[in-house]
Amino acid sequence: MSGNTFGKLFTVTTAGESHGPALVAIVDGCPPGLELSLEDLQRDLDRRKPGTSRHTTQRQEPDEVEILSGVFEGRTTGCAIGLLIRNTDQKSKDYSAIKDLFRPAHADYTYHHKYGERDYRGGGRSSARETAMRVAAGAIAKKYLVTQGIIIRGYMSQLGPIEIPFKTWDSVEDNAFFSPDPDKVPELEAYMDQLRRDQDSVGARITVVAEGVKPGLGEPIFDRLDAELAHALMSINAVKGVEIGAGFACVSQRGTEHRDELTPEGFLSNNAGGILGGISSGQPIVAHLALKATSSITTPGRSIDVHGNPVDVITKGRHDPCVGIRATPIAEAMMAIVLMDHLLRNRGQNANVRVSTPVLGQL
């Protein structure tokens, strides 16, 4: 299987299946001398790990990461960083009844046709369990980006039909939904409780923001910063759409509204989401991603078996009724990996570029 590596200078390679013995990652290209501890990685892993609230899967995985290489006496050496997370709470028997069936809207059918072999336990390689390694790798990138003045944060901006207005970053880490509006949390909880009673699932919208990014990141034409961000975010399980800045709303905007006018005091708006011509503008980089509702539910759904016979599928096991609830740290990680890669690429080619034009902020 190809396609397990992301990045050009800062690269992340992952391996492992949902019910295998462990997940692993190789993170290559991190500059030497960065102070790095297990706690730096574990902090974000704890934000993503399952079983932390009644609104997520009850699979109990501690997601304790081990650093196998690339760090010595608390600092990165410049060598490849090896990471490992052991799986400890697999219940593979939950999936024995569907080993010859295809769950609707899952990767079972497409993996079967592509490889002729598949690990049906918990989705195998296609499971969102894989994203634990992305979060661990992204934590390394986030730690380095902080030294460059770049902060990446995310939040849930919609759950099902409930839109969540942004009020404050202070509340995002104080609830299971990563909601920036504390007043919305009771409504979100009630909605999820009813959803579970209905034996159904729902999608979500996540917003992720990078602040402190200087102008100049991004390689125009095929490696545009927004194109690579979209690539990274679309690679997350269940993501079906990505917007940068105003996104699809730009269709109804006139040019006089959409253009982000410049003044000596700063930009007057940020419809471009901090990226112009594929290159960072110095404004906050803003991306939104839409995650579909998981089809791993106990309500019967029509499908076929490996012989083409019609069947009804009921998926047992422990599943997230809304995969978006745990997606915020994953989105942050993928944005961090992209920005880290482009920061190193820009440093390699343009480290000596100096212009007299001031860097504008946003009014």
UniProtKB/Swiss-Prot annotation:
Cofactors that this protein relies on: FMNH2
Gene3D superfamilies: Chorismate synthase AroC (3.60.150.10)
A Gene Ontology term for the protein's cellular component: cytosol
Gene Ontology molecular-function annotations: chorismate synthase activity; FMN binding
Cofactor binding, per record: Reduced FMN (FMNH(2)).
InterPro entries: Chorismate_synth, Chorismate_synth_AroC_sf, Chorismate_synthase_CS
E.C. no: 4.2.3.5
BP term (GO), one: aromatic amino acid family biosynthetic process
Annotated stretches, region: Disordered: 44-63
NADP among keywords: yes
Residues the record lists as binding FMN: R125, S126, S127, N237, A238, G277, K292, A293, T294, S295, S296, R318
Pathway, per record: Metabolic intermediate biosynthesis; chorismate biosynthesis; chorismate from D-erythrose 4-phosphate and phosphoenolpyruvate: step 7/7
Alphabetic keyword roster: Amino-acid biosynthesis, Aromatic amino acid biosynthesis, FAD, Flavoprotein, FMN, Lyase, NADP
Xref: CDD domains: Chorismate_synthase
Known catalytic reactions: 5-O-(1-carboxyvinyl)-3-phosphoshikimate = chorismate + phosphate
Chain residues that bind NADP(+): R48, R54
Origin: domain of life: Bacteria
Enzyme class: lyase
HAMAP family reported in the protein's UniProt record: Chorismate_synth
General function of this protein: This reaction introduces a second double bond into the aromatic ring system.
Family, similarity comment: Belongs to the chorismate synthase family.
Description of how the protein assembles with itself and partners: Homotetramer.
Protein name: Chorismate synthase
Protein species of origin: Pseudomonas fluorescens (strain SBW25)
Upper taxonomic lineage: Bacteria, Pseudomonadati, Pseudomonadota, Gammaproteobacteria, Pseudomonadales
